[in-house]
Amino acid sequence: MASPLELRRRIRSVDNTRQITRAMQLVAASRMRRAQEAVQAARPYATHISGMIERLVLATGNDRLPPILQPRPIERTAFLVLTTNRGLAGPLNTNIVRTAVSEIDATSDAIEISVVVVGKKGHLALRGLYTLSAVFTDISDQPSVLDIAPVTQLLVDGYERGDFDEVRMVYPEFVNILTQQPRVVRLFPVVLPEVQQDAREADIIFEPDPASVLEALIPRFVEMTVYRAMLELAASEQSARMVAMRAATENATELIEGLRLAYNKLRQARITSEIIDIASGANALADA
């Protein structure tokens, strides 16, 4: 059985850990709110750029669409896997990697696979399973469009060169604080938004011509798609970390209560033993 001194030391150690996890929980909660606000702030731009592409596609015509919008036979597929740089985020990265591995392994053996990873956790998990075409581990957990530009440029250039015929992205969708759902979406060929009736009826003049504007706008649309996914990743990471640290804090509190109970029982037993010894000595002296 542990001594009172050992129990006191362990109580102090667990209490110090609890203070750390509590602080990390509060920091994650603050960052999660900022990440959610960033997701909300990006939506108007995404909505407007989607509407503009609707009008440009209608004005351009299917025969003049840029190559990035035109499907072709799939012989090479690239997977963009978005993960975090840091751990202590519960099962978030494990679920993302598991979804990515499932999607990659389900791809036909006749299709050549390329894997592009964002985040140190994805790099560590996937480097032993596949040959990674590129790894990005220097992107901030509060990303900007400029931060993800090298990623999207790599994919756009590779698709235009014919290095791959399809690009799929694996990332976590922030549903709520307790739920982050891994999703797989196709980046290339770009999935065209459905042309709405008001877009068909809109009379807009594009200069120099709709095809040129569309070709210049599509990379921005891809950037926004990846950027929004990175914002979802940031919100998911902070919410998962907040939940994990809250659970760790609660577990530490329960452990401290158990240790204090054991310490008090041991201390009470020692006091009782000392009282018995004193009483026995007093009785022995009285009998003498």
Features from the language model and the residues they span:
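C-terminal beta-strand-loop-alpha-helix "lid" module of Rossmann-like NAD(P)-dependent dehydrogenases
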Residues: M1-A288
